Amino acid sequence: MQLKSSISLKQQTLFRQHCLIDGEWQDSQNGERLDVTNPATGAVLGSVPLVTVSQTEQAIAAAELALVEWRKKTGKERAALLQAWARLIMDNQEDLAALLTAEQGKPLAEARGEIAYATSFIDWFAEEAKRIEGSVLQSPQGQQRLLVIKQPIGVCAAITPWNFPAAMITRKVGPALAAGCTMIVKPAEQTPFTALALAELAQQAGIPRGVLQVIVGDAQSVGKVLCDSPVVRKLSFTGSTEVGRILMAQSAPTVKKLSLELGGNAPFIVFDDADVDQAVKGILASKFRNSGQTCVCANRIYVQNGIYPTLVERLVEEVRKLNVGDGTQPGVTQGPLIDADAVSKVEQHIADALSHGATLLLGGKRHELGGTFFTPTIVGGVTREMRFAREETFGPVAPLFRFSDEAEAVAMANDTEFGLAAYVYTRDAVRQWTVPEALDYGMVGINTGLISNEVAPFGGVKQSGLGREGSRFGIEDYLEMKYLCVDLSR
């Protein structure tokens, strides 16, 4: 089937409009396809097949078959293949960034950065593949020798989001393949082309058929097949807490191992003794990166009373400079929101706050470019009764709360069911320790608005998820521990 392409790439084979199942590029068995649009222009970029239940089961069977040989490879052999994949990704960084911006909307500079960030996980876990270690235990019985070995958990599945369509895949696939597992990836329907391009490069790198597969389809039906299958031993999901709960329930009958990176409602606390310019810089990086569409975005900005007027003035000044537009254009710093539902949610949160007494300090409306573009917005006088305090906005809106002292700031920040990321700005050396330790969050940035990297463990507490990704701990979620007891009695 010949499919038209609206994206021009140096390596045109990276623009794949079929799913990768058992080493073959397949169309849907029932012919159903889904158009993928550019959120900046509304233009149709291409289409992808919606796989059937039967095709999902075929992918699971292929992953199970591929596991037999893949797990036998040494860590060094798996590392070499992962490193080859990483090199190809960076060799094709411009093409991948173009694909990513076209389907997701973020500025090209951010897209290039994401491709490099995505590659860092593959590089990191390629090295970790060679460092999977066991233990020798001191036995209480003299004639026995006790050992602990680690083995791949088996067939894994990943369900990934649209906001980081490259990095959220490699952060899961990297450790899975390094550990000796096989992986089925189900990317978001809004952004499948980046995932398919990564799979094409994995094939070029020599990763065997069935080891990495990418399927696109209805999230509910595909997700349920993956959860129901006893062959799939591990599921990794990045997305909303609501969907995470559903996947947990569906995985319970087969007692799967789960990694869940779920909703965030990140507090960003600025104390009176903070460096105002650094705090504003941190807010811009944390809140407005990717147009506010990240799980670790500053969703509630708490500013101490003494510094509040100065920070508001500086923040308004800097946010005015943000340039909204098509991410392919030079100088653009804010792309569109992903779809009309995202715009509607932003508008609802702003309207709710204003109806409860908040003040609009900047923006607050759709951008003159139309479509899903939204003006960067600042809302002051926000209180805990407003939706900003309870829900992720996932848009370019900075809601400002006031607080009087440290105890109040910590109490307000912890007043949520979520616990992914938090941020603290202060020059006080003691407070730099006491406040982060008191915050119920899995990650805390202190005098920085950017905390993500491949070296540190990424994940949350409470209803923000289970497990950690990245870091030396990330590979552990793809390994099973086995205890061996050897009796030497004659």
Predicted regions and their residues:
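Residues at or immediately preceding the N-termini of alpha-helices
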Residues: P39, V53-T56, G75, Q93, ...
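ALDH superfamily catalytic-core signature
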Residues: E242-T383, I446
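Conserved C-terminal structural/oligomerization subdomain of aldehyde/semialdehyde dehydrogenase
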Residues: T41-S47, V232, I269, N323-G327, ...
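Rossmann-like NAD(P) dinucleotide-binding subdomain of oxidoreductase/dehydrogenase enzymes
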Residues: G134-Q278, F403
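Glycine-rich loop-to-alpha-helix module at the N-terminal edge of alpha/beta enzyme cores
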Residues: A43-I132, Q143
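Short, well-ordered beta-strand elements within core beta-sheets of diverse protein domains
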Residues: L45-V51, A66-K72, A158, F268-F271, ...
